A protein has these predicted regions:
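Cellulosome-associated attachment modules in secreted, modular CAZymes
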Residues: 138-208
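Positively charged n-region of N-terminal signal peptides that target proteins for export
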Residues: 1-4
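Acidic glycine-/aspartate-rich tracts in secreted/extracellular proteins
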Residues: 29-32, 67-73, 168-172, 201-202, ...
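Bacterial N-terminal signal peptides
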Residues: 7-15
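Aromatic-rich carbohydrate-binding modules that target alpha-glucans
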Residues: 21-59, 67-91
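Intrinsically disordered, low-complexity polar regions and short flexible loop motifs
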Residues: 35-37, 52, 77-136
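Middle-to-C-terminal accessory/interaction subdomains
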Residues: 214, 220-222, 233, 293, ...
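Phosphate-handling architecture centered on phosphoinositide signaling
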Residues: 139, 207-477, 619, 623-643
Length: 644
């Protein structure tokens, strides 16, 4: 009945929809689907040079990107990549060079920052209409016209057909499913067909209202965060750092959160320093207090607790109580952590936190002006509110949440450093973050969990692990972790993750592995643990098997097959995950969004550069080129070389 209803809708739309001119999709780069049936041929000239020859005796609309031009002579001026062709945020990616060829052919050489293509057009047989040129690595995946599900530049009956196919169970990659959510309600249903029909008939899609967590972590926006701290409180923050660089103590200040012109001001909030090896003094050097003139500002991580000093409903931003403000330490590309968390969510790992970019200012009382700290990461804290927001998926938000770190959280030592968050500056391998008054019970549960990982025989472990966790979700999480090259993790370095047990029962619970801290990824590599190359390390032997959880799971053929399947899905072209072209399109979009705001008053990290951290052991890795040192190419080869 449902299928019949959808077919009736499609027939009605075809009856009323205007006819559309033919559009030939020529492809999305040297690996696109070129169409010989329409006289299109491509030759690989080597060294990254490709010649595209077109011989078509008809008018053709050329779909190469998202900008319109009717004259090749003004192509340089019109070809831009970004949210708005007239925006200063746009980035020129190509230099267009036109050269005369024999037989009235013209070669158009598109020289990008990282790639070079040569397209040859036979002008005797080809008539250009209004063209759209798509950057060879694909259009901006975050900027599309509502209803244009197939991304051909228009809303047409073909989009209705594709939407119906998806509703009937047809396959579609992540980006297509995002576009299929025409009404913006975060699911693809028959209501999207109704909205799509309205669009075809000249209607419009109302802008969805962002509320709560979606308001704060809205990836379409670039919010401003302004912190205001009195002189005494700022100097106290510096003194706390000098006494203990790992201080967890808060000072009092106020925050202004500005998004799309809407300002939220909250007084009496808590502000503290955060980070592990990245902890820094935000101004000056040891013993120095604030200098009003020639201030020596430094990038640092900050935590903001809106309810630290006043616990009421007014001390939230649409229900959000805490913010993590993270500078892009050792990430010249300004993209690694943003990419990783978005990839987790894109792959269906719902335990991944929300994150976005923001711009940060700090004002110290008495100063004439506030200091611009530049572009920061705006991260969702993993705490009680994180659990409550995902209560339905976890099954309960009243269990035990553990923060696991310090390179000593291998789940292999029941006598290890296990404690609870007692509001001191002490740091532990395992810190209980919730239900701290029940620490003794929580500790027994964690120790029993460790013992079962280590001591159960294989048959019992196989049965038990499926009872206490979603094995598919865990292996998908770890597949993303390995694919992005996260060497500073649980398996390799006993570090950087959270565990959540959704029940206080000692035996009847489900545990969830929560990924955390992904700045040392995407080619930032280090000789550590079991590996010295985060791009080429065998994904089946990623870490130290003394950290037994993942190693024991992968001993079983069926679990190992699931893990390999998830890895290969991530790097397969067409899935819109982390094959090179899909990854580069997203990275360029993010960088275009923030490019004009990088320069800042700390004088640090003032340019976007395509390179890993300077202290890494593989400085050759890049993200935006197409050569043999491209991290996405290297990682895909390493994954495709394995089998279950």
């Amino acid at each position: 009945m449902r299928k019949f209803f959808l077919l009736i809708i499609m027939a009605l739309v075809m009856a009323v929809a205007p006819s559309q001119a033919a559009i030939y999709m020529v492809g999305s780069g040297p690996f696109g689907n070129w169409d010989p049936a329409h006289g299109i041929e491509m030759t690989d000239e080597g060294n990254g040079i490709y010649t595209l020859t077109i011989n078509i005796g008809e008018t053709v609309w050329f779909v190469f990107a998202d900008k319109l031009t009717s004259d090749w002579n003004d192509f340089n001026a019109n070809h831009r990549y970004g949210p708005d062709g007239n925006s200063s945020q746009d980035v020129h990616l190509f230099e267009i060079v036109k050269t005369q060829k024999a037989n009235n052919n013209h070669a158009y050489k598109f020289q990008g920052a990282n790639e070079e293509y040569t397209f040859t057009f036979n002008l005797n047989d080809l008539t250009f209409k209004v063209e759209t040129f798509v950057e060879p690595l694909g259009p901006d995946p975050f900027d599309f016209t509502a209803g244009d599900i197939n991304a051909d530049g228009e809303v047409s009956i073909s989009d209705v057909s594709l939407l119906i196919d998806i509703l009937l169970g047809g396959s579609a990659n992540y980006d297509v499913r995002q576009r299929a959510d025409v009404n913006g309600d975060k699911e693809v249903t028959i209501a999207d067909i109704s909205q799509l029909i309205d669009l075809l008939l000249g209607g419009s899609v109302p802008e969805p209202v962002k509320e709560g967590y979606d308001y704060v972590w809205d990836d379409k926006a670039l919010p401003e965060v302004h912190l205001d701290v009195s002189l005494d409180e700022w100097n106290r923050l510096l003194t706390l750092y000098d006494a203990n660089s790992f201080t967890a103590q808060y000072v009092m200040g106020s925050i202004s959160f500005v998004k799309n012109g809407e300002v939220t001001v909250i007084d009496s909030v808590g502000i503290r320093l955060k980070g592990n090896t990245s902890r820094r003094r935000p101004e000056g050097w040891y013993g120095e207090m604030h200098h009003r003139d020639n201030t020596d500002w430094h990038h640092a991580h900050f935590g903001v607790n809106l309810r630290k000093f006043v616990d009421d409903d007014a001390h939230t931003i649409q229900g959000v109580r805490k913010l993590h403000l993270k500078w892009f330490k050792d990430d010249p590309a300004y993209v690694r952590e943003v990419f990783c968390y978005e990839l987790f969510r894109r792959a269906g790992v719902w335990t991944a936190i929300r994150d976005n970019y923001c711009r940060l200012w700090i004002h110290v009382g008495g100063d004439t002006n506030e200091a611009y700290y530049g572009v920061y990461g705006l991260l969702e804290p993993i705490d009680k509110r994180y659990l409550k927001d995902r209560k339905e998926r976890f099954g309960s938000n009243n269990g035990y949440l553990w923060k696991c770190r310090n390179g000593a959280a291998g789940l292999n030592n029941p006598n290890g450093d296990i404690w609870y968050d007692d509001d001191t500056d002490d740091r532990h391998a395992y810190t209980l973050e919730t239900q701290t008054e029940e620490f003794d019970s929580a500790r027994v549960q964690l120790v029993n969990f460790m013992n079962k990982i280590s001591s159960l025989n294989d048959n019992d472990f196989y049965t038990w692990i499926q009872q206490v966790t979603d094995v598919d979700l865990l292996l998908k999480t770890y597949a993303v972790n390995v694919a992005v090259g996260m060497w500073d993790d649980y398996w390799n370095n006993a570090n950087n993750y959270y565990l959540y047990f959704n029940s206080k029962d000692q035996n009847n619970y489900r545990f969830f592995f929560i990924p955390y801290d992904y700045d040392n990824t995407l080619g930032t590599s280090l000789r550590c643990g079991n590996q010295d190359d985060a791009g080429r390390q065998n994904p089946l032997h990623w870490g130290n098997d003394g950290n037994k959880l993942i190693a024991r799971i992968l001993k079983f053929d069926d679990f190992r097959a699931i893990y390999v399947k998830h890895l290969q899905f991530l790097v397969t072209q067409g899935n819109a995950m982390m094959d090179r072209q899909a990854a580069q399109a997203r990275i360029r979009s993010w960088q275009a969004k923030i490019a004009d705001y990088i320069d800042n008053e700390t004088g640090e990290d003032t340019a976007i550069e395509d390179k890993p951290a300077s202290w890494g052991n593989h400085s050759e890795y890049n993200l935006l080129k197409s050569n043999s040192d491209n991290f996405f190419n290297v990682k895909a080869a390493s994954i495709n070389a394995i089998s279950p």
